[in-house]
From Swiss-Prot:
HAMAP family: 16SrRNA_methyltr_G (MF_00074). Keywords: Cytoplasm, Methyltransferase, rRNA processing, S-adenosyl-L-methionine, Transferase. It holds the Pfam family GidB. PANTHER family: S-ADENOSYL-L-METHIONINE-DEPENDENT METHYLTRANSFERASES SUPERFAMILY PROTEIN. S-adenosyl-L-methionine binds at residues 79, 130-131, 149. It comes from the Bacteria. It comes from Mycoplasmoides gallisepticum (strain R(low / passage 15 / clone 2)) (Mycoplasma gallisepticum). Specifically methylates the N7 position of a guanine in 16S rRNA. The gene is rsmG. One of its GO terms (cellular component) is cytosol. This is Ribosomal RNA small subunit methyltransferase G.
């Protein structure tokens, strides 16, 4: 795995240390082996794991260097799955306090084992859904940044994340080329959620194209948000298809 990562990263001008690359390779190797026992990811080969979970996530993390470098911030990865992108972001920006949240117990157990093996501090794997009352009460207004790759819809992550943000905190959406319709659909919910569109940034790394879409938290949202998942799914996912 280490050779795969090094060979793939050789074509990019990145400033990772040998230790960071080794830690990422170790993490991806753990994903590969654990994926033989239970479903951590749909990518089954070392080559696909190295490229799709490794290289693409490293490039995503590099695109955030202007906000994460040398900053001590509280950030949360919602629906982290196997720890992507949150744990790689932690490896690249070790001063961050990174919270990795997922409702799958096996995946959280896996992440905790990796954290222990890498002897990391300032990273926390939590078994929960972010819309659960206990989680919301504990982490209301706690985070500087909310992000997710698992929650693909802009309107959905905005609703799930707004109560967790500090005022002036930001939600980051990781998109590719198809995002304009999602931005338009999300507009009608922004005022209720206390959010405002901030900006979007395009990045081209050889054949990789990334778009980061940012929303700022301007006000505290009503207590009814986030709603039950069934309502979110019906109104923000199913309705958006029509």
């Amino acid at each position: 795995m280490l050779k795969l990562i090094k060979d793939s990263l050789g074509k990019f001008n990145l400033t990772l240390t040998d230790k960071q690359i080794e830690d990422i390779a170790f993490f991806l190797e753990e994903i590969y082996h654990s994926n033989q026992l239970f479903n951590l990811t749909g990518y089954k080969t070392k080559e696909l794991i190295a490229e799709m979970l490794g290289v693409k996530t490293i490039l995503l993390a590099q695109s955030l260097s202007y906000i994460f470098s040398n900053q001590s911030l509280n950030v949360i990865d919602i629906g982290t799955g196997a720890g992507i992108p949150g744990l790689i972001i932690k490896i690249i920006y070790p001063q961050l306090n990174v919270y990795l949240v997922d409702s799958n117990a096996k995946k959280i157990t896996f992440i905790n084992e990796v954290i222990k093996k890498l002897n990391f501090t300032g990273v926390f794997a939590i078994l929960s859904r972010v819309e659960d009352n206990f989680f919301l009460k504990k982490y209301h207004g706690y985070f500087d940044y909310v992000f997710s790759q698992a929650v693909s819809k802009i309107a959905v992550l905005n609703e799930l994340g707004t109560q967790l943000l500090k005022i002036n905190g930001q939600i980051i959406h990781f998109k590719s080329r198809d995002y304009q319709e999602e931005i338009e659909f999300a507009k009608k919910h922004l005022s209720d959620l206390g959010l405002a569109f901030n900006n979007l940034y395009h990045y081209q790394f050889n054949s990789y194209f990334l778009v980061n879409v940012f929303y700022n938290k301007k006000a505290i949202a009503p207590q009814k948000y986030p709603r039950e998942w069934s309502k979110i799914k019906r109104e923000l996912i199913d309705d958006a298809k029509h």
